[in-house]
């Protein structure tokens, strides 16, 4: 079916209290792996492409591939710009056919973030394109950090209410203690659930967890078994993820887990099939492994069977 807006997918998740995976792509291999998982789990999906992905593959290419896959499928699929840093990136995504955008002006002060976000909403709303924005900064928070330092980094729930009402965004990414990449926590994985609960109570809109990868053991073990070094990487454990969903997270952004899984399998193939010269024999099994990791994740998110 035609691509839908992420709002359409997330409004249902919000109403029924489950989460949908937003999975990052840069190429055909990850895209096909995500679709395989979605078809097999009967789960809606949000395909996310960052500015880096657009630089790597081109917005038109990412759109054409995603649309081709979506048209053949009965699963609801949205194509979303991840961390658009300025209006120009948003316009590039819209022109290519993306159905959803994130404007990430969270590094600016509140008023400037709001001003830029409003501009994006004004452009996107009439086109039926959904808009995500972010408040607070994605930075791991350690236990011994002071209340003032915590407040400086994490979302302020009262500001969130004001921001959502004034901007008209469709969903919000609150900083509650996660960070991007494979190294999220030194000690115990802890998120600020009290803050999350307040943001949900005050805004009622779908909420997004960035930096949500779990660094699942089976993929990280394989990565290291075949010569990789993840240097003690640590993600958001499945039970913490489930709790976050219980308190209002409806979109779970995942890139790092897919990267680790893909390259773990590539490492295995390189180590066990040293004379292989056909890339398809290396990438094929890696795609299947990514699909397995995503299927496991969809069950945790609660989106399996929701398509
Ligand atoms: O949030 C960041 C995503 O993982 C995309 O990463 O900017 O390296 O494409 P990237
Ligand atoms: P991870 O690095 O935890 O996969 O987060 C991805 C993300 O937030 C994309 O926006
Ligand atoms: Zn992110």
Each model region followed by its residue ranges:
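A general boundary/transition motif marking the beginning of the first structured unit of a protein
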Residues: 1, 151, 282-285
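Basic/polar N-terminal segments that are highly enriched at the extreme N-terminus
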Residues: 1-3, 307
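Alpha/beta enzyme core
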Residues: 4-12, 16, 27-53, 60-76, ...
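C-terminal alpha-helical cap/extension of soluble enzyme domains
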Residues: 225-230, 236-307
